[in-house]
């Protein structure tokens, strides 16, 4: 009977302490302006900022200059057709390459289209003609616009020349001669081939993880600075158990970031008409372990923060690296095994891959089972590591308190 009563008391005390820690952590968040910036300002403003920057999706009227050494009807027709495309604007026809290079250096144009003097002659002789394209590769979207426009025009003029050189008796035969194998290009999931639809969903997921790491790390560093023994755990009877600390603190972050997730993953894509074909219920179930894994990872890393500035010095630069190794901006098959392994230490890697497949391509949880299981494994592993960190901090605080008590007792005895 006593044992049962004791167990009930321990459970009741644990629940009360958990909610005390939850309220205390909530106060710490709202009292710290730096943490408020990471928890609210950054996740609410950054998604809008990136979405506004890439809202045009594709580049239109990319500036190009032409060097036409051929000066023939065919070269002028080629230039006219390129200029007529939506993505490219021919701003000047230069006398030579030096003049064209100077315009590129002055950023008056970002590409050069060069026609050699034998361009028209080779075509009339039945030989292959060459058109050279030079691009400023500091802006890949300009390169994409120039390449697509010139390729389409080359194919179109090639069809016209085949029709002229091989006259057919009927219209149907002429169509077969011009285009023997007709094809239709269909852009799946990203119908505009836009940059925002491709990149912004990955950034939205990454922002959640990075702001949690920075915010929780700052809270941990602040707690150490304020603590007499430079410990992560305050000296209080309410902070006398590992699970109650981990559950209490994580409950605070979960409740705060539910709002952040709704804003970043549902409202922002809706505002900017980004692809959203996944089922909301599926998205919610997938984001849940991602949120758990990110929180417990952040709590684990906060144990190594010695000051409130430490997270900014250590983790801010990792955002670009994590975006690259997530497999979005660069195919994951081409990423070296070492960096691929590093990527899977962070929830952002499976989180980005799974979220894009669900939200943009309409995948189900079964189709992202690998990423989903990985996130739950990460959540479990980082929960254990965060418990170990806080257990170590509790034991360390106890030892330091006992050591301080013995020292003070010895000092008192010596004064007597």
Indicate where each model-derived feature is located.
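Extracytoplasmic/periplasmic domains immediately adjacent to an N-terminal transmembrane anchor
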Residues: 1-197, 392, 398-416
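Hydrophobic core positions of alpha-helical segments in small-molecule transporters
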Residues: 38-39, 201, 247-248, 311-314, ...
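Loop-to-transmembrane-helix entry motif
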Residues: 29-36, 207, 248-254, 258, ...
């Amino acid at each position: 009977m006593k044992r049962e009563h004791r167990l009930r008391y321990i459970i009741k005390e644990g629940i009360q302490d958990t909610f005390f820690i939850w309220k205390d952590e909530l106060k710490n968040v709202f009292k710290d302006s730096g943490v408020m910036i990471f928890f609210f300002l950054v996740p609410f403003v950054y998604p809008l900022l990136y979405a506004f920057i890439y809202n045009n999706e594709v580049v239109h009227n990319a500036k190009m200059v032409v060097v036409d050494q051929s000066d023939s009807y065919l070269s002028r027709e080629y230039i006219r057709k390129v200029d007529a495309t939506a993505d490219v604007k021919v701003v000047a026809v230069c006398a030579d390459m030096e003049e064209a290079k100077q315009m590129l250096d002055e950023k008056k144009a970002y590409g050069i289209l060069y026609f050699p003097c034998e361009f028209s002659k080779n075509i009339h002789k039945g030989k292959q003609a060459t058109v050279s394209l030079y691009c400023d590769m500091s802006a890949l979207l300009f390169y994409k616009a120039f390449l697509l426009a010139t390729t389409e025009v080359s194919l179109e003029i090639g069809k016209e020349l085949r029709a002229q050189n091989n006259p057919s008796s009927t219209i149907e035969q002429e169509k077969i001669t011009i285009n023997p194998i007709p094809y239709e290009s269909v852009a799946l999931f990203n119908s505009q081939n836009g940059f925002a639809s491709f990149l912004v969903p990955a950034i939205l997921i990454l922002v959640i993880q990075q702001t949690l790491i920075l915010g929780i790390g700052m809270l941990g560093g602040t707690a150490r600075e304020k603590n007499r023994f430079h410990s992560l755990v305050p000296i209080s009877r309410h902070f006398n158990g590992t699970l109650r600390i981990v559950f209490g603190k994580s409950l605070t972050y979960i409740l705060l970031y539910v709002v952040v997730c709704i804003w970043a993953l549902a409202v922002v894509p809706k505002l900017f008409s980004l692809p959203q074909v996944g089922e909301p219920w599926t998205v919610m179930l997938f984001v849940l372990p991602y949120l758990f894994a990110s929180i417990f990872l952040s709590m684990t890393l906060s144990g190594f923060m010695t000051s409130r500035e430490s997270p900014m010095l250590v983790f801010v630069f990792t955002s670009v690296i994590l975006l690259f190794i997530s497999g979005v901006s660069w195919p994951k098959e081409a990423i070296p095994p070492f960096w691929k392994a590093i990527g899977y230490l962070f929830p952002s890697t499976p989180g980005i891959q799974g979220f894009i497949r669900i939200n943009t391509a309409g995948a189900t949880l079964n189709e992202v089972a690998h990423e989903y299981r990985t996130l739950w494994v990460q959540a479990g592993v980082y929960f254990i590591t965060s418990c170990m960190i806080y257990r170590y901090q509790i034991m360390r605080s106890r030892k330091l308190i006992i050591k301080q008590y013995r020292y003070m007792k010895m000092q008192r005895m010596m004064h007597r």
